[in-house]
Amino acid sequence: MEQDNLYNLLQSIDTPDDLRHLSADKLPEVCKELRQKIIDELSCNPGHFGSSLGVIELTVALHYVFNTPYDRIVWDVGHQAYGHKILTGRRDAFCTNRKLNGIRPFPSPSESEYDTFTCGHASNSISAALGMAVAAKKHGENNRHVVAVIGDGSMSGGLAFEGLNNASATPNNLLIILNDNNMAIDRSVGGMKQYLLNLQMSEGYNRIRYKISQMFHRWGILNEERRKSLIRFNNSLKSMLVQQQNVFEGMNIRYFGPIDGHDVNNLARVLKEIKDMQGPKLLHIHTTKGKGFGPAEKAATIWHAPGIFDKETGERIVVDTKGMPPLFQDVFGNTLLELAQTNDKIVGVTPAMPSGCSMNILMKAMPERGFDVGIAEGHAVTFSGGMAKDGLLPFCNIYSSFMQRAYDNVIHDIAIQKLNVVLCLDRAGLVGEDGPTHHGAFDLAYMRPIPNLIVASPYNEHELRCLMYTAQLPDKGPFVIRYPRGRGSLVDWKCPMQEIEIGKGRKLKEGKDIAVITLGPIGVQAEKAITHAEQETGKSIAHYDLRFLKPLDESMLHEIGKRFKQVVTVEDGVLKGGMGSAILEFMADNEYNPQIKRIGLPDQFVQHGSVKELYHICGMDEEGIYKVLISF
């Protein structure tokens, strides 16, 4: 009851209709309660913190001014949409956010009609919202508004510019909200960041243009000829009143702002003024990531997703990791620095994830050799290719699910030319609470068919170090190393690095009845299951670590094909087209006929939950592998 008293207004808002019945003077209090609700919930149930706090006022203003869900709001990335979820019927369920069978971590149309488009990756909001705005026009729904909310570094993505470039090509009333907080997860980078910092627009120009537009709209005399005349007048007016060229206006998108994104009443006023203007338009707002929670405002990167924390003191509850294996990410970062200290050709590239992938270790020690290119995965790959073409050796680290956005670049710009680029796919396999948009489910299947690639996955931290060492040796060509999120299995991980023969797996355990073939760290789960199954059944089970999906260790597979009638494959990726499929193809091509059972991700988008829970559901944990082994 005491907790409910903190949310007197919020408790009365079950849908945005309830919000719209409040007087405008109540909106600041709604914002205060909404911000406190997120702080309270995320202090004990971790999630994306800073981004959601930064758009509280915008979220309230949007649902207050627009007739959602008839009017469409498309969130870019979606990690800032917690306030939106709470205001749209999920207030009481918000405590289940990111938990197994709870509400989803990002907006999802299957969860709510207020979630207009699936999101989780960056830079797609303008294109999606533009499509909706054009569809509304085609359907004669001239009173339907469509809003794209983009920020958190997403404007550095090429898809955002493709949407902007196309926005004025077809009649529509799209409104783009540019949430400018100078942040992605880490600090935003690049020319667009600097442009937005400097951008100013004449208030007189905006005011005059708006009044003229309203007058023509009110009189009903805005035909095509007059619209073209207005555009010519607009350009002349702009040349007189605007002090600098505006890239958005150059694309025939009306620009408004920048304005304070934390003044909810002024935001609502401006949105009301511009929402019925004809044609595409952009409202530029300035916000602070983590607004309203002091520690998050001061350290936005750490507080992007801080984990559990004390909401009174702001102290993050850090788990004691002494005696635990390291994160694969930290092994990568430290090993990269170690290699760079002896190989002056090595450089590091990351698309806006230096802290997430631990590229920041190299960037701090050797800032001139680390490149954060912003949320631009395709550019990151081709940029790496360009450096490799002229003698550098890039380690390009991209999350597996985000590498999907750069697939053509891998084929066209790296593989065909057989360039010496090391593609490190972090977060490969199931990642847990971030759900289907972030699981690294497909990389084995989509990398396997590409000629000239080497595709490998380490069993543990030692193998990661040795694969990185091998990849930086001369003339290896394009080299893909995939590894999961989280901790490995070895506490003592700083082994001497040595070359691994390309395409060579290893036999971890001898056996005579069943052969288990694994790829990557999921082999540790199989190792436990093998011990359990042997104890229960008395069967002798061999264990092979494939290490390389491409090229395959054909001599090892010939041995398995000749010796075993029962084979189990285990992989942390989709079964269709993955490692198990490669084994099936090899056995068929070489006329071996063992009984093969494959363990991996099913043909569906796996939901969110802890990795442990999801492994169990997919039958990929020790228990699931054990059940398959004893089923022969």
UniProtKB/Swiss-Prot annotation:
Q: Where is the signal peptide?
A: none
Q: What is its EC number?
A: 2.2.1.7
Kindly give the HAMAP family that the UniProt entry links to this protein.
DXP_synth
Q: What name is this protein filed under?
A: 1-deoxy-D-xylulose-5-phosphate synthase
Q: Which family does it belong to?
A: Belongs to the transketolase family. DXPS subfamily.
- Subunit annotation: Homodimer.
**Residues reported to bind Mg(2+):** 152, 181
Which GO molecular function annotation, any one, does this entry have?
1-deoxy-D-xylulose-5-phosphate synthase activity
Which SMART domains does the UniProt record give? Answer: Transket_pyr
Q: How is the cofactor bound?
A: Binds 1 Mg(2+) ion per subunit. Binds 1 thiamine pyrophosphate per subunit.
Under NCBIfam families, the record lists: dxs, PRK05444.2-2
Query: Mind naming one GO cellular-component term on file for this protein?
Result: cytosol
UniProt entry keywords in alphabetical sequence: Isoprene biosynthesis, Magnesium, Metal-binding, Thiamine biosynthesis, Thiamine pyrophosphate, Transferase
* Cofactors: Mg(2+); thiamine diphosphate
In which organism is this protein found?
Answer: Phocaeicola vulgatus (strain ATCC 8482 / DSM 1447 / JCM 5826 / CCUG 4940 / NBRC 14291 / NCTC 11154) (Bacteroides vulgatus)
Binding of thiamine diphosphate occurs at 79, 120-122, 153-154, 181, 293, 377
Its encoding gene is what?
Answer: dxs
**What pathway does the annotation place this protein in?**
Metabolic intermediate biosynthesis; 1-deoxy-D-xylulose 5-phosphate biosynthesis; 1-deoxy-D-xylulose 5-phosphate from D-glyceraldehyde 3-phosphate and pyruvate: step 1/1
